[in-house]
Structure formats: C-alpha cells, structure tokens
Amino acid sequence: MRYREEAIECVKDHVLQIHKQIYAKYEGDFDRIYTEGYNSKSYTGRVIEPGKILIINGSPRKKGLISQMLGIMREEAEKRGDMVEMVYTNDLTVKPCTGCMACRTKGKCVLAEDDSQRVLQMMQQADAIIMGAPCYWGNIPGQMKLMFDRQVYGMMRDTNRFPEPLMKGKKCILISTCTTPWPWNILFKQSRGAIRAMREIARYAGFKIVSTIERGGTVMHPELTEKDKQKCRKAIERLMKVK
C-alpha cells in the first residue's frame, strides 16, 4: 500500500510540474495555454492534438435536427482546433453498386468515377468520422447507404477467414433521430435501427466508436433542447480524449 501511495504522489507531482511549465511558458494566457500548450506534443495529458474530422451528413434536410446536431459538433471541434469537413450525401452523385464483386479483387471500383471515390479518399485522410442519419424504416436513408455500398473495397478487405478492417485506428461518432418517441424509438428499433446499420459499417471497417446519440420524438419535440446540445458537445469532448 505504501508503494502504491508513493507512486500516486510521484505521478501527481509529475503532472503538476507539466502544468506549471505550460503556465509559465504562456504567461498565464489561458486561451493560448489550451490551443497551443495542451494540444502540443510536449503535453502528456489526456487531450489529443487537433486532427482532421470528416462529418457525413446522411440527412436530406439541411435545417433538420441531424444537420443542427452535426453543426454543433462541427463548431465544437473547430473551437478545439480540429480541421472539419462536412459531406451531404443528398448532394452527391453516386451510381448504385451492381454487385459485380470486381472491387474485391482489383481493390477499386470498376464503375465510372463519381463522388463515392472522392468521399472515400476524404475518409482515408481523416482521423475521425462523424456519421449522422435520420431513421428511414428503421435504417439509414438510401442516399447514405448507396454511398457506403460503393466504398466497401476501401473500408474492408476479404480474406480466407474474417474481413480485414482498412480504417483501423480511426475514431467514430454515430448519431440518429426519429419521429418515434423514447423509449419506443429504441424498443421498436427505429433510431436504434439506424445506429445499428451505421455501427455495422463502422465495426467492419475498423473504426473505434467513441459515442452514439439517439434522439427520438422529433415530431412532438421538433426543437433541440439544451440537453441535446450538451450531448453533442460531450461527444466531441470524448472524441478528443479517447486514443
């Protein structure tokens, strides 16, 4: 027990010294301490350096709740120093997958190049992905599914045993909304169904899912509450902390 207490005190002292060094370096300027000090490589605490985040908005409604929630996440991430890009699947030009399976052996889609390849490249370059989708028949909207169908070769590779994830090391947040109120949105697998579909894609691709948000009852409660907004901010906070 004595050694454990000594180890804890040693760690506390080390962390305190780091804080003192950063405070002295930036002369007590808390804005610079956060953006430059705690995000620098010299800091060994829990906050991770800024990175690239790609937001995939599966909602066709740019002023809907999904778009609002993703907007809050974007604002919070940019405030913390991340580079953020957003893609609206409804704006993409993507032809349907034909199921020819040629991409599994060639490592690329043999159909004419369109936005599916462009977004895939953005995903490959990102450190984290945020997927947001309203519930359509207990699933994600067709526009979003269409895009992911065409990207499978860049997200997982077939092997003689289990699929090999190609997005390993990247993090992910999933959010969904539906008209069905809580708890029926979960019990009847409405928003939960959309989350399940996105989780399946993320899991086989190798993403580490750090947070999921489900918001039911969008007809009865069409405005975001402060609690909803706080959940979005907390998800970004968790994204920054989880390695």
Language-model features and meaning:
Residues 60-61, 91, 179-180, 217:
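Short, glycine/serine-rich, charged loops/turns that create anion-binding
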Residues 93-123:
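Cysteine-cluster motifs in flexible loop/terminal segments that predominantly coordinate metals
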Residues 51-80, 181:
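N-terminal beta1-alpha1 ligand-phosphate binding loop
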Residues 57, 88, 213-214:
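Residue-level recognition of beta-strand->loop/alpha-helix junctions
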Residues 14, 18, 26-34, 45, ...:
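Glycine-rich phosphate/pyrophosphate-binding loop and the adjoining helix
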Residues 3, 8, 13-18, 22-25, ...:
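Helix-loop-strand module that forms the ligand-binding subsite of alpha/beta enzymes
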Residues 83-93:
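A short beta-strand-loop structural module common to alpha/beta enzyme folds
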